[in-house]
Amino acid sequence: MPQLDMSPWPMVIMSMILTLFYITQLKMLNFTFYNTPSSKLSMPHKHKTTWELKWTKIYLPPSMYQ
């Protein structure tokens, strides 16, 4: 039984990978990527939390009387 000559296989594999990469790039060239809407046009909505709505007094620790 004759043995299979393996010398051309690395070249075949490399050319296949290169061809697939080239075809993929050509397919992506026709694809339109839409830009995400910029946030500069719309003002960011600030959510009000409950602790921002009311004023809280900060107490100091009890001091020693002299």
Swiss-Prot record:
One GO term describing the cellular component: proton-transporting ATP synthase complex
GO biological process, one term: proton motive force-driven ATP synthesis
Main location: mitochondrion
Modified residues (N6-acetyllysine): 54, 57
Transmembrane residue ranges: 8-24
Residues recorded as bearing N6-succinyllysine in the entry: 54
Cell location: Mitochondrion membrane
Alphabetical keyword list: Acetylation, ATP synthesis, CF(0), Hydrogen ion transport, Ion transport, Membrane, Mitochondrion, Transmembrane, Transmembrane helix, Transport
GO molecular function terms noted in the UniProt entry: proton transmembrane transporter activity
Membrane topology summary: Single-pass membrane protein
Coiled coil: none
Subunit structure: F-type ATPases have 2 components, CF(1) - the catalytic core - and CF(0) - the membrane proton channel. Component of an ATP synthase complex composed of ATP5PB, ATP5MC1, ATP5F1E, ATP5PD, ATP5ME, ATP5PF, ATP5MF, MT-ATP6, MT-ATP8, ATP5F1A, ATP5F1B, ATP5F1D, ATP5F1C, ATP5PO, ATP5MG, ATP5MK and ATP5MJ. Interacts with PRICKLE3.
Entry function: Mitochondrial membrane ATP synthase (F(1)F(0) ATP synthase or Complex V) produces ATP from ADP in the presence of a proton gradient across the membrane which is generated by electron transport complexes of the respiratory chain. F-type ATPases consist of two structural domains, F(1) - containing the extramembraneous catalytic core and F(0) - containing the membrane proton channel, linked together by a central stalk and a peripheral stalk. During catalysis, ATP synthesis in the catalytic domain of F(1) is coupled via a rotary mechanism of the central stalk subunits to proton translocation.
Family, similarity comment: Belongs to the ATPase protein 8 family.
Name by which UniProt lists this protein: ATP synthase protein 8
Source organism phylogeny: Eukaryota, Metazoa, Chordata, Craniata, Vertebrata
